[in-house]
Amino acid sequence: MSRCAQAAEVAATVPGAGVGNVGLRPPMVPRQASFFPPPVPNPFVQQTQIGSARRVQIVLLGIILLPIRVLLVALILLLAWPFAAISTVCCPEKLTHPITGWRRKITQTALKFLGRAMFFSMGFIVAVKGKIASPLEAPVFVAAPHSTFFDGIACVVAGLPSMVSRNENAQVPLIGRLLRAVQPVLVSRVDPDSRKNTINEIIKRTTSGGEWPQILVFPEGTCTNRSCLITFKPGAFIPGVPVQPVLLRYPNKLDTVTWTWQGYTFIQLCMLTFCQLFTKVEVEFMPVQVPNDEEKNDPVLFANKVRNLMAEALGIPVTDHTYEDCRLMISAGQLTLPMEAGLVEFTKISRKLKLDWDGVRKHLDEYASIASSSKGGRIGIEEFAKYLKLPVSDVLRQLFALFDRNHDGSIDFREYVIGLAVLCNPSNTEEIIQVAFKLFDVDEDGYITEEEFSTILQASLGVPDLDVSGLFKEIAQGDSISYEEFKSFALKHPEYAKIFTTYLDLQTCHVFSLPKEVQTTPSTASNKVSPEKHEESTSDKKDD
């Protein structure tokens, strides 16, 4: 009898190894209940429904209000420019020193008045709640949720504190001069040291004892639809100084202000807002939050505490989405997937699975190659089997079910990334690859023939007529598979890790099902693996 036939016979003696008796198969280790889906699946989309009656109202009001408001805004900007010029004349380009004396007093007073006048001319009715803290009480304002470019109204209400802005914005004619008048912290996208310099500048200003203006930061770093608070970036919390949370609400029947990655454009929102009779906005200044010693040393802890307080006051949940999710959304769209397919809650994924953005982006390319043929950008069991070049079998369904965390019959990108990291990568170690190769190499000649490859997979998957020629040719450079080819393929395709280790589980189950005296008998086959040694290596559990 050939070694391949012997291997198949051994697998066949395992309880439940036969087709149709999968209930007795050694079950794949169940995953831990973790990585719960976020309470808000996509905070970066806004779909405002405008009825026919409302459309007629917008058109009628727009005929009168739109040109008037555009002219008023332009006039106010022109009036503000001379004050901004007086404030910034002879100031160094990098704003190394604060604007002081009469220039600061006159220009701040004039610009605050003109700022309020501009938002009033746009139709905004502003309600202010709470007490604004002094620079000594709270050097930093943190405003959320950040949902629109109109959120600049918080800066006007707070007394024109400094803001963090891109360096390119300061070069825009007219607008750039007005921006420089509030002494912003400028961030450069081309300077590799920009992040470090920005943090150092924030620390310098917030610890100046009131010499510099207060700083207003939108810690979310991007706009959302106000349905939740996403991850707060730690920049505003690194100095370890007291901060004052600022809540922003837009309690209007028709939302014409929300500016997200999927929704109305800048021009469309301006036109819709200007065509409203009025737009309500509430700016609430919460009590100052003073960090304790632990929070001073851990800005992420301080940021999370402040975020939770703000979310509780707003009555909305928090999620671990961040700006990197927006970048993944754009990448998903470029790969012809639905944009929302790229959402993974990047903060949680990167922290728990130790993945950086480049790693997740690489997985998105892999995911797109599988899901591009399906509707909705999700992987079904058929696409899963086609990608693995294997038929739909009971073992494959078990593996698919482990990826499918919410049991909806499909795998989304978030589930795919978690599955690779938690289920496949722990089983894809050098040791496991070596053991798997030895099991496939039945005659122990250092190479796997197509007959050996087919026999072991047929036995482990319980599919006696399995055709693996396509998969074999993808791995092998010639008529057989060397260890280097096997290892290279396993590392590039961690999805196969569970398939390759299924046969190990079968052998383990077989050994433990034998009488004790047989279990203790030394095996003469050099390519058998010890159950005790393998017990840990096949686990797909991972602490969260």
From Swiss-Prot:
Notes concerning its domains: The HXXXXD motif is essential for acyltransferase activity.
Coiled coil: none
Transmembrane domains' residue ranges: 58-78
Pathway: Lipid metabolism; phospholipid metabolism
Residue intervals on the Lumenal side: 79-544
Protein name: Lysophosphatidylcholine acyltransferase 2
Family annotation (Gene3D superfamilies): EF-hand
InterPro entries for this protein: EF-hand-dom_pair, EF_Hand_1_Ca_BS, EF_hand_dom, LPCAT1-like, Plipid/glycerol_acylTrfase
SMART domains: EFh, PlsC
Reactions catalysed, as given in the entry: a 1-acyl-sn-glycero-3-phosphocholine + an acyl-CoA = a 1,2-diacyl-sn-glycero-3-phosphocholine + CoA; a 1-O-alkyl-sn-glycero-3-phosphocholine + acetyl-CoA = a 1-O-alkyl-2-acetyl-sn-glycero-3-phosphocholine + CoA; a 1-acyl-sn-glycero-3-phosphate + an acyl-CoA = a 1,2-diacyl-sn-glycero-3-phosphate + CoA; a 1-O-(1Z-alkenyl)-sn-glycero-3-phosphocholine + an acyl-CoA = a 1-O-(1Z-alkenyl)-2-acyl-sn-glycero-3-phosphocholine + CoA
Motif (HXXXXD motif): 146-151
Segments of this protein annotated with the region Disordered: 518-544
Domain of life of the native organism: Eukaryota
PANTHER family on file: LYSOPHOSPHATIDYLCHOLINE ACYLTRANSFERASE 2 (PTHR23063:SF21), PHOSPHOLIPID ACYLTRANSFERASE (PTHR23063)
Any one GO molecular-function label of the UniProt entry: 2-acylglycerol-3-phosphate O-acyltransferase activity
Keywords: Acyltransferase, Calcium, Cell membrane, Endoplasmic reticulum, Golgi apparatus, Lipid biosynthesis, Lipid droplet, Lipid metabolism, Membrane, Metal-binding, Phospholipid biosynthesis, Phospholipid metabolism, Repeat, Signal-anchor, Transferase, Transmembrane, Transmembrane helix
Cellular compartment(s): Endoplasmic reticulum membrane; Golgi apparatus membrane; Cell membrane; Lipid droplet
Main location: endoplasmic reticulum
EF-hand domain boundaries: 391-426, 428-463
